[in-house]
């Protein structure tokens, strides 16, 4: 068994309708690759994980936030990081996430490393 975790999204993603937006992204990505997923059902998890990451990225872009769950741990005896360097952003609603999806997909397409 494998566990996939995405810590990309800002806290502002916890808003009404955001789960519906995620469900739509997952459904759209799965539908686009239907035959491929029928041939290899193990790819469903990767497709869903990609949708979750894209959802979080779009939320971060909409909120103008670089906040995410996976922070470098603070260890005893190490210099403190300047927390003010992290942009908290601003509250968003589900339609803000939808509006940011094209930019999120563009960013992913321009930074992707495709395997042959």
Go through each PLM region and give its residues.
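Small-residue (G/A/S/T)-rich helix-start motifs and N-terminal tracts that mark the onset
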Residues: 1-116
């Amino acid at each position: 068994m494998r566990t996939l975790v995405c810590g990309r999204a800002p806290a502002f993603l916890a808003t009404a309708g955001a789960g519906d937006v995620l469900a739509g992204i997952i459904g759209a990505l799965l539908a686009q690759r239907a035959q491929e997923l029928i041939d290899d059902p193990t790819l469903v998890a990767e497709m869903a994980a990609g949708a979750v990451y894209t959802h979080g990225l779009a939320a971060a872009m909409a909120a103008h936030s670089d906040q995410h769950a996976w922070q470098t741990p603070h260890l005893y005896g190490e210099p403190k990081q300047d927390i003010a360097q992290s942009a908290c952003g601003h509250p968003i609603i589900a339609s803000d996430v939808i509006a940011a999806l094209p930019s999120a997909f563009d960013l992913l397409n321009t930074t992707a490393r495709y395997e042959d």
